[in-house]
C-alpha cells in the first residue's frame, strides 16, 4: 500500500482558517491553533447575533409604534387591539415605518383603531 502524505490537505485546511481570521490581531491571525479557536468563537457569536437581530428589531418596532400611538392618545396594546378589530393587518415593521415617516397616516390608523375599540 502506498504511503499517503497529507501536506496539501493540511496546508489547504490551515489556509482556509487563516483566511477567515483576516483582520484579527496578533496570534489570532498568525497562529493556526489560536486562529482556529478565534474563528470558531466568531462564528458562534455570528450565529447568536443573527437570532438576536430579529428580537432587537421587533422590540425597536414595538417601541416606535408605542411612542406614536401614545402621541395619538392610545397605548400600544390598545392600538394593536383596535387595528385587529378594525381588520387592518399591517405588520409591526410596516407600522413602525409609517410611524416614523408618515405621522398623518399613522394618525389616521389610530383614529380607525379608536373607532373599532368604541364600536
Swiss-Prot record:
Signal peptide: none annotated. It comes from the Bacteria. InterPro entries: Ribosomal_bL20, RIBOSOMAL_L20_CS, Ribosomal_protein_bL20_C. Pfam families: Ribosomal_L20 (PF00453). One of its GO terms (biological process) is translation. One of its GO terms (molecular function) is rRNA binding. Keywords: Ribonucleoprotein, Ribosomal protein, RNA-binding, rRNA-binding. GO terms for cellular component: ribonucleoprotein complex; ribosome. Binds directly to 23S ribosomal RNA and is necessary for the in vitro assembly process of the 50S ribosomal subunit. It is not involved in the protein synthesizing functions of that subunit. Belongs to the bacterial ribosomal protein bL20 family. This is Large ribosomal subunit protein bL20. It comes from Xanthomonas oryzae pv. oryzae (strain KACC10331 / KXO85).
Amino acid at each position: 500500500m502506498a504511503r499517503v502524505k497529507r501536506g496539501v490537505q493540511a496546508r489547504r485546511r490551515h489556509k482556509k482558517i487563516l483566511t477567515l481570521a483576516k483582520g484579527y490581531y496578533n496570534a489570532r491571525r498568525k497562529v493556526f491553533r489560536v486562529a482556529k479557536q478565534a474563528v470558531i468563537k466568531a462564528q458562534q457569536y455570528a450565529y447568536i447575533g443573527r437570532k438576536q437581530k430579529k428580537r432587537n428589531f421587533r422590540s425597536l418596532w414595538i417601541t416606535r409604534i408605542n411612542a406614536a400611538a401614545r402621541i395619538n392618545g392610545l397605548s400600544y396594546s390598545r392600538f394593536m387591539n383596535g387595528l385587529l378589530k378594525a381588520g387592518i393587518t399591517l405588520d409591526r415593521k410596516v407600522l413602525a415605518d409609517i410611524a416614523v415617516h408618515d405621522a398623518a397616516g399613522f394618525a389616521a390608523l389610530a383614529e380607525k383603531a379608536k373607532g373599532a375599540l368604541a364600536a
